[in-house]
A protein has these predicted regions:
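Short, solvent-exposed amphipathic alpha-helical segments in soluble enzyme
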Residues: 168, 324-328, 354
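Helical hairpin unit composed of two closely spaced alpha helices linked by a short loop
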Residues: 304, 314-336, 340-341, 345
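N-terminal localization/anchoring segments of enzymes in phospholipid and broader phosphate metabolism
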Residues: 1-295, 299, 303, 341-343, ...
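Active-site donor-binding acidic/aromatic loop of nucleotide-activated sugar
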Residues: 366-370
Length: 457
């Protein structure tokens, strides 16, 4: 009864509430236990996490000012909406470089770790104990021996993708490492957090250079090595004032996990101007009052005048975003959604395909990229605004996971990202409404059943 009441009062998605009520009442013992483990998706950060130093950056004034108005251009209202949703300032004068696949990202990240003189912060969802993971572990160990202050945070579930977990190797090398929200049979009091994962990817070197995006640390990202399960992905090297916001996000997660507050010039030095891109970090998670990524996406779609390009590995965004996509298309905005023809999760593919017709019939375009599986996440609006980071267009990223994205304003950077999109579209197949409707009835039924579980995927 208590589980049913909790589901009715706390589930914002009516489908999720209905499914959980069905499970609770049809499985009298197992149902409530499953709900306790997987259905409770809110946690409260310990007060210590609030003690993390506020970001030391130069916010754009409320009127944006003449210089920054030219950078934000006709997307000033989008900037204001996001400011109200996340209460984090935009920062000017940043420089961002894309790093394609582990072939480009890993050497750059390893070189940065080897160059560190004061501090290293590393947060990853998956950190495998494979060839690539061992390279990172060894580089971190070398940094510790040089006297660099190192902190490594890995999602507890993400450590289980390889055995033995990389944490064993890191601890043996005296690298300070912690697991985010660990849970096991021996810690039943943590069962309510087992479904809440930290999907963020952050590396900050000396508080001045950062890396973020969608890439985990695993060998499959290095395509030149011809791995068994290759994965294409996108990461970014970042310099400028916005690096302090990335460091603050890491410091908050580290304080929440370990109780240690990272502060002072060692972690938050003064940051020089490095470029011409206006940027801001957007953090999201089940402890936040607002679903900040969802609100950002809705605001961006409402502001779009000419074009929207979405690159995501998983796509079942929910009714509100489907409506926003369709409204943009009906206003004459060209909406392109680029997905992998087959992801690494078959059941998720089925759920996604069951709702393609909803956006195709209103004029959105869906493009399917050939193998290898593309795990990249990117959104471009009007060739001027870019959203990059860890979040996918699915219920897990938009409601359950701790995510970290970055929004960037500037035509030069958006043009560079547009070329990456163009390259992916060259070999892609455009899915039509007729094609989607031509699926056989057994396939449609299978996909529709899978979609019922989309709130949990």
């Amino acid at each position: 009864m208590l589980a049913s009441i909790h589901a009715l009062l706390n589930k914002r998605d009516s489908r999720a509430a209905t499914l959980w009520l069905g499970a609770i009442w049809s499985l009298p013992l197992l149902g409530p236990m499953l709900y306790l483990a997987l259905g409770v998706n809110r946690i409260r950060r310990r007060a210590i996490s609030l003690g993390v130093r506020q970001t030391v950056v130069r916010p754009i004034p409320r009127d944006l000012g003449e210089t920054q108005t030219s950078a934000v251009e006709n997307l000033e209202m989008l900037a204001r909406v996001v400011s109200r949703v996340i209460k984090q300032p935009l920062t000017p004068d940043n420089h961002l470089d894309p790093l394609v696949n582990g072939d480009e990202a890993f050497p750059a990240m390893l070189a940065a770790i080897d160059s560190a003189k004061k501090s290293i912060s590393l947060l990853s969802y998956i950190f495998d104990n494979d060839a690539s993971g061992k390279q990172f572990a060894d580089a971190l160990a070398r940094a510790v021996k040089r006297g660099v202050q190192v902190r490594v945070l890995i999602d507890a579930a993400g450590t289980r993708y390889s055995w033995p977990p990389i944490t064993h190797r890191l601890k043996h090398e005296k690298v300070p490492v912690a697991k985010f929200l660990p849970a096991s049979l021996f810690t039943p009091w943590r069962v309510t957090t087992v479904n809440l994962r930290n999907h963020r990817k952050v590396l900050v070197i000396d508080g001045q250079t950062a890396f973020t995006g969608g890439m985990n640390i695993r060998q499959g990202n290095v395509l030149a090595d011809k791995p068994k399960s290759p994965v294409r992905d996108l990461h970014f090297r970042i310099e400028g004032p916005v690096v302090a916001q990335l460091q603050e996000a890491f410091a908050s997660d580290w304080a929440f996990t370990t109780g240690e507050v990272l502060d002072g010039d060692l972690w938050f030095p003064e940051l020089p101007d490095r470029g011409h891109t206006v940027a801001r970090i957007i953090t999201d998670g089940p402890d936040a009052d607002f679903e900040t990524v969802r609100w950002t996406l809705l605001a961006a779609l409402a502001e779009a005048q000419n074009s929207v390009q979405i690159l995501t590995p998983y796509f079942f965004p929910g009714n509100s975003l489907v409506t926003a996509l369709n409204l943009a298309a009906l206003r004459g905005v060209r909406v392109d959604i680029i997905l992998p023809a087959n992801s690494n999760l078959r059941f998720v593919d089925w759920a996604s395909r069951s709702m393609w017709w909803q956006v195709l019939e209103r004029g959105c375009r869906i493009w399917l990229t050939p193998p290898p599986f593309d795990h990249s996440k990117l959104m471009i609006v009007d060739g001027h605004w870019v959203l990059l980071g860890s979040a996918n267009w699915d219920a897990r990223s938009l409601r359950l996971n701790f995510e970290l994205n970055l929004e960037a304003y500037g035509r030069n950077f958006a043009e560079r990202m547009g070329k990456i999109i163009e390259e992916k579209l060259r070999g892609a197949h455009e899915m039509t409404l007729a094609e989607a409707d031509a699926r056989g009835y057994p396939t449609k039924l299978r996909d529709a059943i899978a979609r019922l579980f989309s709130p949990f995927l």
